[in-house]
Amino acid sequence: RELGRSIYCAEDSTVFLVDHLGVQKDKKFKNFSRSPKNNLTTTITDELKLFTNQRSKVIGVSLKDRGAIFPSGHLANAAYWYNPNNGHFVTSSYYMNKLPQWLIKFNNKKKSDSLLNQTWKTLLPIEKYIHSEIDDSSFEKKFKGKQLSIFPYDLKTLRKENGNYKLITHVPQGNTLLTELVKATIKGENLGRNETTDFLTISYSSTDYVGHNFGIRSKEL
């Protein structure tokens, strides 16, 4: 109401994108100015930090910024989310001014590229999926460059016309990428290595995107 406009749930103009080059204050990165500032209550992770007098380490990860930020709360040590412009995971200056070395190394492995060279296909023969609708439904969203919404999906062919690195958020490989980040986070941050409870929040986003694009009874979901 004070601004006279709608606001994004995690927007915060006082903080900036932090990537492998450090703090990015250029206005072209304003969509990465994110924090939990707009959350008006505490979270379970905040209460854990208070209970342990900040000894607990709390980190949130997700493809979506809001999926990483809000579950990990106001007092999180870090929240990392996906940058669809280059396939890297980033954060904001709310948490830090430079990425940890383990995350820079993870980004440099370009796992999103290798996953986007794959083909999205069913695990079982498609006729085994008897509790979903037909594969080619008129209600399903089509990827650009593909005439029908049917398996298989050649991601290497589709990525150029469908947002390049952004495509991975709309296919199961996005969940695979996040799982790889989860494993790297546990190791890189030494989570769970002492008597104090740590908390890693994980929000898988690709399932949500696939549901929106194809429907809850689709073969894809």
Where in this protein do the model-derived segments appear?
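Polar, low-complexity loop segments and adjacent catalytic/binding residues used for recognizing
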Residues: 202
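Active-site-proximal segments of metal-dependent phosphoesterases and phosphodiesterases across multiple
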Residues: 216-221
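His/Asp/Glu-rich, glycine-adjacent segments
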Residues: 2-196, 205-212
